[in-house]
Amino acid sequence: MPLPTRKIGQSLVSEIGFGSMGIARLGPSGFYGVVESDDERFKVLDAAHAAGCTFWDSAHLYGDSEELIGKWLKRTGKRNDIFLATKFGITPQGVRGDPDFVKEQCATSLERLGVDCIDLFYQHRVDPKTPIEITVGAMAELVKEGKVKYLGLSECSAKALRRAHAVHPIAALQIEYSPFVLDIEDPKIALLETARELGVTIVAYSPLGRGLLTGQYKSPDDFEPNDFRRTIPKFSADNFPKILDVVAQLKKIGEKHNATPGQVTLAWILAQGPEFIVIPGTKKIKYLEENVGAASIKLTEEEVAAVRKLAEESEIPGDRNARMGAMLIDSPELPQ
């Protein structure tokens, strides 16, 4: 059954996509602890496809995510059903956006995914050494060569987005956005304002607060030992009472809709405007189905306002990522 769609460039994609970071294997486990076998992970991808959740997000950095999706595409022959996004540029030594590396990472992603064209190719983080005009110029060459359809940026500054867009249209901005994280709305950051002005779609990653807005976690002790959420300052034990209070209030709003706190959260983000798309990830089919079910939840204006008030007043301290230094940064100026 198809989900409602929204635009990226001139393409229509499911308004609720699938983020594949959580399902990826990285070494012996994954970003969020234990990872299932390929067969079990294929079942999750099968369920996403069957539910009409056909905008899939991956990254060069996400362990075996690209390979897993590539195997699924080969196994099913359903390449034409999936709008495929991936990201490049993060290395163990830092971020790279030099032209040779852009081309190298695209070639690797095409091979891993087993496709001849990537629908949406993002720079994962801004390279603090390479002017963004040079990076996007190299990305634009990939469009000319037919290897990429649309270009995107992730966690850039408003100025970097504007400079990039002047070189080649930027179709999407991937950014963390949820009731916990409203950074892009800050007038000093001006990222939402700039994206709207330029017609850039907002793809919200971690829309469920990395799972904490679902109510599934009652304390950091609920995270598996190797779960990277243990490193996030915002999710400290001291903050959990505030986090759980937000969840309780979302649950109360959801009762009128027979909806979970997570569904209310996704519905609220989608209610921010037609330029918003969400890409929650999960390792389990039951949570995938819950996420997709948010498409049928229509909050009233009063409920949208109530969630906003909750988000603005919750004031949960701490960085949203242990590596905040790489977030929302600008790019060096192009030499004259």
From Swiss-Prot:
Molecular-function GO term, any one: aldo-keto reductase (NADPH) activity
Binding site for substrate: 124
Primary enzyme class: oxidoreductase
InterPro entries (alphabetical): AKR (IPR020471), Aldo-Keto_reductase (IPR050791), NADP_OxRdtase_dom (IPR023210), NADP_OxRdtase_dom_sf (IPR036812)
Pathway it works in: Mycotoxin biosynthesis
Lineage: superkingdom: Eukaryota
Stretches that traverse the bilayer: none
Key words, A-Z: NADP, Oxidoreductase
Enzyme nomenclature, EC number: 1.1.1.-
Induction: Induced in strobilurin-producing conditions (on CGC medium after 6 days of growth).
Name of protein: Aldo-keto reductase str7
Gene designation per UniProt: str7
